[in-house]
A protein has these predicted regions:
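Short, solvent-exposed loop/turn segments at the edges of extracellular beta-sandwich modules
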Residues: 103-109, 218-224
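Helical hinge/lid and interdomain linker segments adjacent to catalytic or ligand-binding clefts
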Residues: 252-346
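Bacterial Sec-dependent N-terminal signal peptides
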Residues: 3, 8-39, 222-226, 462
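A glycine-rich, often tryptophan-bearing local segment used as a flexible ligand/cofactor-contacting loop or short
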Residues: 305-396, 400-405
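Solvent-exposed loop/turn segments flanking beta-strands in beta-repeat/beta-sandwich domains
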Residues: 56-71, 150-173
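Surface-exposed, short loops/turns at beta-strand junctions within beta-sandwich domains
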Residues: 87-95, 202-210
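Hydrophobic/tyrosine-rich beta-strand signature of extracellular beta-sandwich/beta-rich modules
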Residues: 53, 96-102, 147, 211-217
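Extracellular ligand-binding/catalytic regions of CAZymes and related secreted enzymes
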Residues: 17-20, 418-420, 425-462
Length: 462
């Protein structure tokens, strides 16, 4: 037993002496989840590829990995990554050499990295114009289009989006999604806008025939998308300083045109039909902002008819509120005639037009054919309807407005309230808004009272 104990101690002593010569650190080993990718032609991978790898170290642990892609190196502690490979301009395909070398906890790197040839193919970008972005066959001053550009290799690989008008040159518009608006003048020059911001002017509008807008995208490999094109459309330019916007039926608009003709006012006319969609743009903003900016005076006729928008139906006064505000801020002058309904008690129009609120009451307010709207400001004519006008809604003028008309209202079944039927607003010492809360076309008895009012507004007030 003693001999066995002495032998064990001797082994222990000699073993301790052996620590002066430690075992050398062994290099780690690196492996890719796949060791080869065999694809050709259209079966090649896209430029965005996700790869996985791992490392093993028999005498320690893995600290990270050295990744080399076509001689460009990086270090990571991750075991996977999505690579966005690039292809040189003008090339459709290429083979990417990728190596992964593990590094252990003592800084030793795998001397025989895992390697992989990645066959990739560039995907061409795609661009699409919203087909609802234009009127089907015509555009009044402004054509607005919405578009999207995508790329299966990643939208970030799109380097430019370009448009051209008819046979013109291709022009870059950036890659951020935007509404593009094009406004023509009588000479065929076109100002183009991005999200209502003016960019530049070009020539090339065809005011006699059809017009086309073309769009294409280019990726970082220099590959272009197929060209997308709007439907052909006829283009009408602004030809006067005054615009009539009629949101009532066309036969009523004929009355307004006759009155403006009698007043010798040159004007352009825009008929809007909520049922047929005639004259209604797919994108009210910025289309109408740009249309209005082409004029110095506007006459707006509307009522409680609702019109379609991208975000739902609404009244024309609300839809045009923002564009109207910008028009007025730039010095424009606006005449508005609108009949109201109880559903219009609130809305964006109250912030823009010279109206604080509408007057509603139980019962009914009406104007008879012997009622008179008496002017409260000098120079404005009195107004008398041809027939009984039901559903009259008076207004409370806004704090910065001046009452214009007082109505001799017949009050039925307990109706009670203010009887103001119009108001004006002044800017820089002169009237820039005239608002009447009534269907002006019926005020033509015994003479053309509505026409006299328009004559006074557009030839004396504005």
């Amino acid at each position: 037993m003693k001999h066995l104990l002495y032998f064990a101690l001797a082994v222990l002593v000699f073993s301790c002496r052996g620590t002066d010569n430690p075992v050398a650190n062994k290099a780690p080993e690196t492996l890719l989840q796949v060791d080869s990718i065999v694809r050709s032609g259209d079966l090649r991978l896209g430029t965005n590829v996700t790869l996985h790898w791992y490392g093993m170290d028999v005498d320690g642990f893995i600290n990270g990995y050295h990744i080399t892609v076509d001689e460009t190196s990086s270090f990571t502690s991750s075991t996977d990554s999505t690579f966005s490979f690039s292809i040189e301009a003008g090339q459709d395909t290429t083979d990417i050499l990728l190596t992964v070398a593990a590094e252990d906890n003592e800084g030793l790197i795998d001397p025989s990295p895992a390697t992989l040839i990645v066959p990739i193919k560039n995907a061409a970008p795609e661009v699409a114009i919203d087909p609802d972005g234009l009127l089907s066959d015509s555009a009044f001053i402004v054509a607005t289009v919405d578009w999207r550009a995508t790329d299966d290799d990643g939208d970030e690989t799109i380097e430019s989006v370009e448009f051209k008008l008819n046979a013109g040159n291709w022009l870059e518009i950036g890659t951020s999604i935007s509404l593009l608006s094009f406004a023509t003048d009588p000479q065929g020059n076109v100002a183009y806008y991005k999200n209502a911001g003016f960019i530049d002017s070009i020539s090339g509008a065809d005011l006699q025939g059809e017009n086309f807008i073309f769009l294409r995208a280019r990726d970082r490999a220099g590959v272009y998308s197929e060209v997308d094109t709007t439907a052909g459309f006829y283009w009408k330019a602004a030809n006067s300083a005054t615009l009539i916007i009629n949101g009532q039926p066309e036969y009523i608009g004929s009355t307004y045109k006759e009155w403006m003709d009698s007043a010798n006012v040159d004007y352009d006319y825009l008929q809007m039909d909520a049922v047929s969609g005639a004259g209604i743009p797919a994108y009210w903003d910025p289309t109408f902002e740009i249309i209005m900016s082409s004029y110095s005076k506007i006459a707006l006729f509307t009522d409680a008819t609702v019109f379609p928008t991208k975000s739902g139906d609404d009244y024309l006064l609300n839809i045009l509120a923002l564009s109207t505000q910008k028009f007025l801020q730039k010095g424009g002058k606006l005449f508005t005639a609108s009949q109201f309904s109880s559903n219009m008690a609130g809305g964006a129009f109250l912030d823009i037009f010279p109206v604080e609120s509408l007057v509603f009451s139980s019962g009914q307010a009406r104007l008879t054919n012997d009622s008179t709207l008496a002017p409260l400001q000098p120079g404005f004519p009195s107004l008398q309807p041809q027939n009984i006008v039901l559903g009259i809604t008076p207004i409370i003028p806004s704090a910065d407005a001046t009452a214009l008309y007082n109505g001799q209202i017949t009050k039925i079944a307990g109706w009670n309230g203010a009887t103001t039927m119009g108001a004006t607003r002044t800017q820089n010492g002169s009237i820039n808004q005239v608002f009447v809360a009534l269907p002006l076309h019926v005020f033509n008895r015994p003479i053309n009272h509505g026409g006299i009012l328009l004559d006074h507004v557009f030839n004396a007030v504005f």
